[in-house]
Swiss-Prot record:
One of its GO terms (molecular function) is phosphopyruvate hydratase activity. CDD domains: enolase. Pathway: Carbohydrate degradation; glycolysis; pyruvate from D-glyceraldehyde 3-phosphate: step 4/5. It comes from Legionella pneumophila (strain Corby). This is Enolase. Its cofactor is Mg(2+).
Amino acid sequence: MHIHKIQAREILDSRGNPTIEADVILTTGIIGRASVPSGASTGSREACELRDNDPKRYAGKGVQKAVKHVNNEINQALQGLSVEDQENLDRILCQLDNTENKSHLGANAILATSLACARARALSLNQPLYMTLNQGDMMTMPVPMMNILNGGAHADNNVDIQEFMIMPIGAPDFPVALQMGTEIFHVLKSVLKKQGLNTAVGDEGGFAPNIQSNRQALDLLSEAIEKAGFRLGEDIVFALDVAASELFNEGFYHMYSENQKFDSHQLIEYYANLISSYPIVSIEDGLDEKDWSGWKQLTTHLGNKVQLVGDDLFVTNPKILREGIAQGVANAILIKVNQIGTLSETRQAIKLAYDNGYRCVMSHRSGETEDTFIADLAVASGCGQIKTGSLCRTDRTAKYNQLLRINELASLPYAGKNILKR
């Protein structure tokens, strides 16, 4: 299981922007391959995504510098090492970079290598990736958080909240959950058409119409769920990604489509009213990533009612999560491998969350590739929830299809309503 060579290339992500793909070639000839995604709505403390900044090429978004780092320094440092010891490989990658935010080699270069090593190991063992990624956690098939109505930075419309998601918690298993979500997605399209609303899709495959308010978005989803023959609150519940850092300006949160602005306390009351009107079970990034006093209020007021997920707040960083746990901020963390940059550090964040009673939600990015690593990691870690977009665009459905394959291979329970237990 020793590394013969590591090589990288520039490929395109789902938005048509360059990203990096790495091949880890073992002495046996086995090739582990991984590519990395890119976010649009990003936390300020995420690990550094290295771009070329050459305006003459891909509008400055090329990743040839990161590719060269893989082909040169990283290749030289890892040649001859075994992929059996993931922590050692990731430690060497971090030491080689030697910056707090991986800005020297680039988190994209480091992550592509880290994940490709893990995949090479699975191939060497002739085992499915989810099995080799499992570290003793009870594996489950995750509840998909299906982002079928898009706004914010993920869509070119006037909707403030970034993601309106449906969660088929009442399904008996993952394939039925996927079927339920897909049927609702198609019914929603006809509901939108009937009302003369746009049915073009956003970056993550959800519809992105111009509508009058966040409540209207939830009403449209409610109508689609009912018309598809499912029970709102029993079969299907809602989750929101507010991405509030994108709405925060000069001390206030601006809901532009509703012509309203709120301070932290008022926005918490706004959420409380939404929760009393709709079966919302999860709110992600409900406040700005720097508004920690507001987050404490939010957690005190709503933390016993809904899942409060920190994305921009924690950026999959164990150090920042530790601060949040100490201060009683949020009760769940979004897991995005490219926010931290190695598989080992991602695992550390997951373990820290579990050890302190925080939930984990595995997540894609808005700029994705066909790589399905996060589907396997969601199952392996037993996190019970996954965000990987809507029910169209191959970059999104690739992850759902991988989960179907895993479900076929393994007799694993579907997380379902267990995610609601507090």
